[in-house]
Amino acid sequence: MNISELSIRRPVLATVLTIIILLFGLIGYNTLGVREYPSVDNPIISVTCSYSGANADVIENQITEPLEQNINGIPGIRSLSSVSQQGQCRITVEFELSVDLETAANDVRDKVSRAQRYLPRDCDPPTVSKADADATPILMVAIQSDSRSLLELSEIADLTVKEQLQTISDVSSVSIWGEKRYSMRLWLDPTKMAGYGITPVDVKNAITNENIELPSGSIEGNTVELTLRTMGQMHTAKEFNNIILKEVGGRVVRFSDIGYAELGPADIKSYMKMNGVPMVGVVVIPQPGANHIEIADAVYQRMEQMKKDLPDDVKYSYGFDNTKFIRASIDEVKSTVYEAFVLVIIIIFLFLRDWRVTLIPCIVIPVSLIGAFFVMYIAGFSINVLTMLAVVLSVGLVVDDAIVMTENIYIRIERGMRPFEAGIEGAKEIFFAVISTTITLVAVFLPIVFMEGTSGRLFREFSFVVAGSVIISSFAALTFTPMLATKLLIKREKQGWFYQKTEPFFEGMNRIYARSLNAFLKRRIWAIPVTVIMLIAIGVLWGQIPAEMAPMEDRSQISINTRAAEGASYEYIRDYTEDINNLVDSIIPDAESVTARVSSGSGNIRITLKDIKDRDYTQMEVAERISQAIRNKTKARAFVQQQSSFGGRRGSMPVQYVLQAVSIEKLEKVLPDFLSKVYDNPTFQMADVDLKFSSPEMRVNINRDKAGTMGATVRDIAETLQYGLSGQRMGYFYMNGKQYEILGQINRQQRNTPANIKSIYIRSDKGEMIQLDNLVEFVESVAPPKLYHYNRFISATVSAGLADGKTIGQGLEEMDKIAAQTLDETFRTALSGDSKDYRESSSSLMFAFILALILIYLILAAQFESFKDPFIIMLTVPLAIAGALIFMYAGGITMNIFSQIGIIMLIGLVAKNGILIVEFANQKQEGGENKMQAIRDAALQRLRPILMTSASTVLGLIPLAFATGEGANQRIAMGTAVVGGMLVSMRLFLIL
């Protein structure tokens, strides 16, 4: 007695098992988290260290190199990159996916703490954070007021909003864009300082000595103990202005005599506006692998709670929210599930033309789909685009077994058999075929388990959900379906009018198919040239179809990065960015929001469009219009960017090609030639390189002999320049219970030309004032403003956007050609960002494709105990793949991970249909029929079930192939590949 017979004999048992599947599936659905994609973020740890006033070369040698040297030994590192720039070093450590984030963070902290003894004493301690320093924020809260200054808004954002949001689970950091943090600015006048014989170092020492509060002990009496507190801290600009610096001829010299103190912003070279209104933005950056929707929901909840804490004249809004696209995309896929379900039911009814027979698959489909959520739950997955796509694909797959089982039982009932016996006999005949098709479909997805990197993580969840759905549907088909069939199906004495009207069509179809099959079986040799033609078509089209990681999606967001020539002032880049902002306003006046942000050297404009349903143009069209328009804005450079599907880095182009060399001189020599070839290549647009050699600098060459003779040391000179010009922190002060910086610097009006520096004085060891011009020589030069390392090599990353119609695969091929023409054997090349993910996913998907073919062949061989029968089935695979490629080429679909996974699915779908015919043919041969007759009978008998299941699969995927709304392009890619492959293969499969 098999499980089908047991279920027929014990219907309550079969019903209970089905209810348990439904119950567990519903519980799983209600407890699963929601996100856009499976967690595919590599663990990334960032190390930052500040050293005010130091240039890139000093930062690289004294900070970056010691830190990198120690970090490099940590196991599991995928890439180690760094940037050394004026006053700061940033190191990004990317680990393999298998490494735990907390373990990685602890390892990095340990290595950084060991390296600290090699760092300069007066640099800030390095900070370690669990996120990429360039990670994209998922949400921005805009804080605005008509009556308050940006200083006040920044304080509210910091003390009220940021404090609350950074405690949300899985948030890596909360930053304030456009922040004007309070500081005590000490503006120095070099002329007055020279007159009073005071240097910037004297001011620093006075601050250190006069702004201090140390523990002072206590007074202990017999009955009372009093704690002493020395009130040495200063809190107001007036107190700082009154600091006594020295006494000259009986006259006290205060700070107000050589400058002035004011409460002002620490960062005076930045601003931020949203829709033209100055504001500050609180942005939330998630940890790698975090659930973005849960974080966004928590932010909304916290902001609602904070309403009562904000002043009445302070308003907040959401500048952007990336989770809107995620929610809409998931909702679109969910609606696709319902559409697919309805279409599948319609096709089943059109074929069976009996509501009782149709009712059985209608009941079985939800069992398999709901059960899939239990598979997600026990595997620790989430509801995301890929798991929901798996559910959509399952609609067409899970119905197959139910249709085949129901149809086989129904035929026997129509022949006069009692439902009970028909159920047992029909289930027994089809039992092995159902098991075989299930194993075959599951085997298709087994290779995905072995895939590494981003693509492996992405489609592991997809494959498990499809495989789980198919296994559950197979179980339901072998238990619940035959039981239902024996209860619902009856022999009709007279068929309904719809059946009678349509039966001639099906009988005619059978006759035409029988004639075609007989004709082809007499000319079986034609199968070989047809297969060869299809293989040639595959070879040609595979090379013609452009490849990329994932199709670009309309996320209703565009970003424009602006950059000026090296050495350009903050005001210059600010004016250029505002010019681009005005241009954007003229091109898309109905944008939901336009946020402009500028800091020294660069700017960014983030455009948030209306929802897709509220506009009649696409994000890509707007991006192209802006790209064309900004070409006329030549004062500086602007780069239009659109976020990739799997990109998490801010401001990164799709093509990221890294050149590595042993010395910066070699890079300086080859970069101009390399870049000129990239600029001339029509594949690229908006190309740029991060390593520049054109930043103007003034080198101070010290005459050591002269300085020594006059009693001045190199430290005296360096500290005077450091505290006078770099904006170095001189200490801290407290206001409203919070700590802020004290920043000293010479007035900008008195340090805006090289000649101003010559008038600065230093004090010798004899107490004499010496003009700096007497000890040093000023030489104008150029140097890189930023120095880059990639995997410990000095590097330069060439970034490029892609011309309209070009893909990342074509871009990387062109980069490889340029590198071969330009670089010698001492150079290395590497990929970064989306380019690296694409290259890794391409190789692993090809491996999965080949392994799927081998596994299915071996499994079929084991099932049929023959190496020949599986080969017959496998010959139909090229038909499906060729069909998929033809439809993709005609529809302009790229070869991406979505279309490729659809092609891998086709292998199982086509093999499944082949099993049904070959299995029945073998059974008939065992029953005594000759080979050719067995083939004819099996093909004719399985014609309707195969057409029905194939049509169900195709119609179940039609909503994907014609998808609209958020996330449509990836659904179209997968749907087109599977639908195209099924349509072409079914035309030829039933004959071949």
Residues of each region from the PLM?
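Transmembrane alpha-helices and their membrane-interface boundaries in multi-pass membrane transporters
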Residues: V395-I409, F431-F450, R457-Y499, I605, ...
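Solvent-exposed, membrane-proximal periplasmic/extracellular interface segments of envelope transport
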Residues: V58-K130, T191-I212, Q233, E571-M653, ...
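Signature of alpha-helical transmembrane segments and their immediate interfacial
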Residues: M1-T31, I430, F498-A550, I607, ...
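Hydrophobic transmembrane alpha-helices and their membrane-interface caps
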Residues: F24-E36, V342-I411, R418, F450, ...
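Helix-loop junctions and hydrophobic alpha-helical segments within the transmembrane domains
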Residues: G319, I326, I330, T406, ...
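Extracytoplasmic/periplasmic membrane-proximal domains and adjacent transmembrane bundles
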Residues: L6, Y37, T48, R90, ...
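Transmembrane helices with small-residue packing motifs
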Residues: V12, I19-N55, S113-C123, Y377, ...
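Flexible hinge/switch segments at interdomain interfaces of large molecular machines
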Residues: V34-I45, S81-G87, D122-S147, S175-R181, ...
